[in-house]
Amino acid sequence: MRTLLIRYILWRNDGDPSYYNDDFKKLILFDELVDDDDVCTLIKNMRMTLSDGPLLDRLNQPVNNVEDVKRMIAISAKVARDIGRRSEIRWEDSFTILFRMIEKYFDDLMTDLYGEK
């Protein structure tokens, strides 16, 4: 699951077709949970610098169920899409934060996406 999410978010950042995976079709559906107009506000609330990727912990939004997990993934993907490609982005920090927030619900997410763990 971690590898899939990393590849998906990086793909959303640069659109590199070598990252594409058919599972992305399921993940991109999460975009409906986050309005495009809210992305600028979310970026502002994350107080990001030019070298930051999505810093979800700065939003102070709880993750209490699989729907919250989907929303966090959608926020990460949309922010990654909108910040543009830069070599200095510290993706490791962003992914560490994301996984720390959602790992408790990985099994639920797998069940939701694929009908199994």
UniProtKB/Swiss-Prot annotation:
InterPro entries on file: Orthopox_N1, Poxvirus_Bcl-2-like, Poxvirus_sf
Keyword annotations of the record: Early protein, Host-virus interaction, Inhibition of host NF-kappa-B by virus, Modulation of host cell apoptosis by virus, Viral immunoevasion
GO terms under biological process: symbiont-mediated perturbation of host apoptosis; symbiont-mediated perturbation of host defense response; symbiont-mediated suppression of host NF-kappaB cascade
Pfam families: Poxv_Bcl-2-like
Domain of life: Viruses
The keyword Ligase is annotated on this UniProt entry: no
Inducing or repressing factors: Expressed in the early phase of the viral replicative cycle.
Protein family (similarity comment): Belongs to the poxviridae OPG035 family.
Function per UniProt: Bcl-2-like protein which contributes to virulence by preventing host NF-kappa-B activation in response to pro-inflammatory stimuli such as TNF-alpha or IL1B.
Protein name as annotated: Protein OPG035
Organism for this UniProt entry: Monkeypox virus
